[in-house]
């Protein structure tokens, strides 16, 4: 009986917390300014921050702001698949890092307020969409680390790479990526490119305030790859060695 009461109380708290988070217009979400790194993890995340060239779909937008308010995204319309342009307040790239099987893994994640998400017949899309790249290195200390491999969001599943071409990497650290519509699934995905894209202000998971972390974790519609259970599972799935 005591356990049952605790579970009911916890469910009530969760529902209350979830109800307190506000969705706001995607154009009004304020990105976080890139902070001066203070740990090896943060310095490594900056060292390997990729360039992103937008070939298809929206530019990346911020997903959450300091007070925990979340992007409401954009409505997907089948007959209106043109790009939704840039956020007037600036863009964002998120990161989270950890060790996995003696490799230092850095996930970079971009949020899109709408995207093509077609599998099967017809055309379909999502109001919220994430793309991510996981950079695998041999050390959390950026002074001693080197790039070992990369795992990318693909149209279906993940694409894993341990042999990188020099034309896709700047100075051995900075990946050149692009967003595109995949052949399989016709979904927004990532792949390597020769073109030099843009960078966005980086905010790491640890640098996010508690309100923003909690909002991203509890909002099931956003389904961010950075939240605890997804991040850990994705590292296992993405391991390329």
From Swiss-Prot:
Domain of life: Eukaryota
Keyword Metal-binding attributed: no
Glycan-modified residues: 144
Main location: secreted
Induction field: Expressed strongly at the early stages of host infection (up to 24 hours after infection) but subsided quickly afterward.
Cystines in this chain: none
GO CC terms in record: extracellular region
Keyword terms, alphabetized: Glycoprotein, Secreted, Signal, Virulence
Keyword Secreted: yes
Residues spanned by motif Conserved undecapeptide motif: 105-115
Compartments where found: Secreted
Motif range (Conserved heptapeptide motif): 125-131
Leader sequence segment: 1-19
Pfam families xrefs: NPP1 (PF05630)
Domain remarks: The structure of NLP effectors is remarkably conserved with a high level of conservation of a central region containing the conserved undecapeptide motif AIMYAWYFPKD and heptapeptide motif GHRHDWE.
Role summary: Secreted effector that acts as a pathogen-associated molecular pattern (PAMP) recognized by the plant immune system. Induces necrosis in Nicotiana benthamiana leaves and can induce Phytophthora capsici resistance in Nicotiana benthamiana. Also significantly improves disease resistance of Arabidopsis thaliana to Hyaloperonospora arabidopsidis. causes an inhibition of plant growth which is typically associated with enhanced immunity when over-expressed in Arabidopsis.
Family per similarity comment: Belongs to the Necrosis inducing protein (NPP1) family.
Protein name from the UniProt record: NLP effector protein 7
Gene that produces this protein: NLP7
